Amino acid sequence: YFAVCLTKLSHTKVELTYNLMRTFVAGLAFAMPFSLVYQMMSDRMKGLQKSEKVIKGLPFAAGFTAGTAVSIAGNMHYVIYAQIIPLIEKLTGKEVSSYWLPDATRYIGYNPCREEDRTIHEFPCYSFVLGDLHAHVINVFLVLTVLGILYSWMKTNSGKSWRQKEIGLLGLLMGMFLFSNTWDFMIYYVVICGTLLLGNLKRYSSDPFISQALKWSVIQWVELLAAAFLASLPFHLTFENVMVQGIGIVKIHTAFYQFCVLWAFPLLVCVPFVIGILKSIGTFPEKKFWSFFYSIKYPDLYGLVLVLCAIGLIFMPEFVYVRDIYEKTAPRANTMFKLTDQAYIMFGIMMAYILVFFTVNRIKRCNGADSTVMCKGLLRCPRLQSLTGIIAILVLISTCGYLENAITHWFTGFPKRNAYQTLNATNYLETAISDDAAAIRWLNDNVEGQPIILEASGDSYQDYDNRVSAMTGLPTVLGWYVHEWLWRNDLEEENQRKEDVQTIYTSSNADQIKSLIEKYKISYLFIGSCEAEKYGEINSELLTSLGKVVCRQGETMIIEVSDGERAD
């Protein structure tokens, strides 16, 4: 939806903006974490004594690391299974294991195989290489916008809630999440509520600060919900949710070693940061709670929210899951997928903030500068702490090798500049199924409105299934089988449609075909390579007698059916 809006605003062809949108989202996935962490680090350095200040380029280094961690880096699965294990196998004379780009996102339940608990744990870099423009990918730059606005609110939190533009803007974005990717609404409503609460606790860090902070937090939480539901009201008036069937309790849990492969590294970086902040409460006179909020810097307080939320997101699929059509073989898949994808973004931001400041700070201490301690709980010796920080940064950088590996495997070799082809996302059809491509061009050039076109029903991840509806935007009788099942949760209707589509293409009963054409208000029949492959002998002679052939290209033709009712 967002991509099409930008397409129309820019007067650009949709076949071009598909690839432009991929690069647009990927670019913002670097630029926005860079901007956020750059500002957080700049604010963290304010007010330090001259002897405490670290190098001027620290905000840039932290921002660059954040952009890299969110948009380019992979996870530790790549480092272990694509680098360390193959190296050991090579040195010991064993056959070297291969590594395929989805391996890093299909680990729990796949290696080793557990048919009853297959899971998904994707991250932005994988989606960018894959060419994915699903809602969770498009929403990457929007959730990063939310995180940026939240930090801006926390820094400038003054005045009553209804005077704060950030609350209204956040409500609008949350309303967009309700109809674009509801998972992000649930995740970021918690993130926002946590930030508002801690921000208000800092703002009212004097007696009786808790009652004031809670009062304004509750008001803002309600305002946020009201704004979100108001913004999404047109959607909810017509939307019927049949995808979710409730909440389930997890019966099969992730093996400890697999959990460590995926999440031990970010936890080892971020948990000491949390411990260091919480331990600092005990350093204040009489251990007064309000003194902690009065003294803590905004970047650290905001970072605390992000780390705690990220930790919650990776542990939640170990306890509960949202029930959907995958429940029998992959009950946790969708829940883990959507939650950990956002955890990865938050961890990426915070690992950059923590590691860069911690490492440079400890190096300065080794050189004799008496700097403030950002995280006291890791190691006591500054030299060992410096070495630990450097090693952690190198480990983070090593995960970036996943990008090169993924690109090389997905595109059968790393793309070279002189091998550039085109931005046109439909160009591959011209060489693969040129007759179909010509017929699709005819539809785009000659058909207006939204008449229904019949094509072969689709199956998941096939090369050219549903290529007509996808490349023209025209509705068809049945799209991808599993996706239609997930969205509508009505297998009886779906199976009936699948059978009816096959009947239209293969039946020799003209009255039966006419009845189905009228039932689905079909205006055009598309007969091409996929239909011939899927249904074998198509009764082309009978179908052409039902209407007029308006386009013929080689073995492909489009029939405008005379008995069909237009759905313009």
Regions inferred by a protein language model and the residue ranges of each:
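Signature aromatic-anchored transmembrane alpha helix within multi-pass, membrane-resident enzymes
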Residues: 214-230, 287-291, 359-407
